[in-house]
Amino acid sequence: MTTAFYPGSFDPITNGHVDVLVQALNVAEKVIVAIGIHPGKAPLFSFEERAELIRLSLAEVLPGKTGDIDVVAFDNLVVDAARSHGATLLIRGLRDGTDLDYEMQMAGMNRTMAPDIQTIFLPAGTASRPITATLVRQIAAMGGDVSAFVPAAVLQALTSKRPD
């Protein structure tokens, strides 16, 4: 069984992340969605909230495939975390050339540290290309409509986080 590791902050999960996950399930039988925990960062959503939003979002889009996806936390090197979960593929989504330049550098470093783990780049769909979780948080915090950028469960969670 091929296992893929899809790391990110997912704060929150966006339609772009979901798009990449759907594609990832076409190249791997199992996908580990790995939420990075960084002590120096103050995320909008806790790990538990992000994990639940990922599960709810995927249940909307992939009702029959949720058993093929695990959600975990990690706070170490991506390749070490991937290896500890038995993953041989590292999934990275690409929106544009800027992402590609950065991700190619990371893929090279990861390949040197873990030659047994292959990085797979999956392009974001046209509709999800401009979406970033940072922009979603900023727009939502200012009362903007982010419904085109996030799954319904995330929209509801963002609305509940907004001060009245």
UniProtKB/Swiss-Prot annotation:
Cofactor: Mg(2+)
GO biological process: coenzyme A biosynthetic process
Pathway the protein acts in: Cofactor biosynthesis; coenzyme A biosynthesis; CoA from (R)-pantothenate: step 4/5
UniProt keywords, alphabetically: ATP-binding, Coenzyme A biosynthesis, Cytoplasm, Magnesium, Nucleotide-binding, Nucleotidyltransferase, Transferase
Main location: cytoplasm
Site (Transition state stabilizer): residue numbering on this chain: 17
Location of this chain's protein in the cell: Cytoplasm
Pfam families: CTP_transf_like
GO MF term set: ATP binding; pantetheine-phosphate adenylyltransferase activity
Superkingdom of the organism of origin: Bacteria
TM segment ranges: none
Class in the EC hierarchy, top level: transferase
Record GO cellular component, one term: cytoplasm
List of residues binding substrate: 9, 41, 78, 92
Annotated EC: 2.7.7.3
NCBIfam families: coaD_prev_kdtB, cyt_tran_rel
Subunit structure: Homohexamer.
PANTHER family assigned to the protein according to its UniProt record, in alphabetical order: PHOSPHOPANTETHEINE ADENYLYLTRANSFERASE
Annotated protein name in UniProt: Phosphopantetheine adenylyltransferase
UniProt organism field: Rhizobium leguminosarum bv. trifolii (strain WSM2304)
Gene name, Swiss-Prot/TrEMBL: coaD
